Design a protein with these regions (language model features):
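Charged docking surfaces used in two-component/phosphorelay signaling
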Residues: 18-26
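Short hydrophobic/Thr-rich beta-strand motif most characteristic of the beta2 strand and flanking loop
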Residues: 28-35, 43
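C-terminal output helix
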Residues: 89, 107-117
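Active-site residues of response regulator receiver
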Residues: 55
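Receiver (REC) domain active-site loop signature in two-component systems and cognate sites
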Residues: 58
Length: 136
């Protein structure tokens, strides 16, 4: 039996998780979605995720702090940063602190699926579904 990829999505905009959760589940990935960074960090403390997708700008805790906490717990976890406020400086900081990739909003679910697929391959996961949604 093949090991399932475990992925956490953290974005304080509810629509993001509602769109991305099902899109990534179609790939055969086990997805947990959070809007509250405190709850997400608690869950990250309880379970090691293979991939974490986090927004950078959130209230209370920013995505860079989430990135640092994830990497401190498990260096193998691939962290994908998403933001509507993309700048070269923010991208450089995130990548410099160990982010796997950086995606600027707005993006299509297929864009994220492609990055997740690359992250999964980097972790040694094979056979993820490359589902392409026709209207995304």
């Amino acid at each position: 039996m093949e090991k399932k990829l475990h992925l956490l999505i953290l974005d304080d905009e509810p629509i993001v998780g509602k769109r991305l959760g099902p899109a990534l589940s179609k790939m055969g990935v086990e997805v947990e979605v959070f809007e509250d960074p405190h709850q997400a960090l608690k869950r990250i403390g309880e379970k090691t995720f293979d991939i974490v997708v986090t927004d950078i700008r959130m209230e209370d805790i920013d995505g860079i702090e989430v990135l640092e906490k994830v990497k401190a717990k498990s260096d193998h976890t691939k962290v994908i940063m998403i933001t509507g406020y993309a700048t070269v400086e923010v991208a450089r900081e995130a990548l410099g602190k160990g982010a796997f990739d950086f995606i600027a909003k707005p993006f299509k679910p297929n864009d994220l699926r492609e990055v997740v697929h690359r992250a999964a391959e980097a972790l040694g996961f094979k056979g993820l579904s490359r589902v392409e949604a026709s209207r995304e």
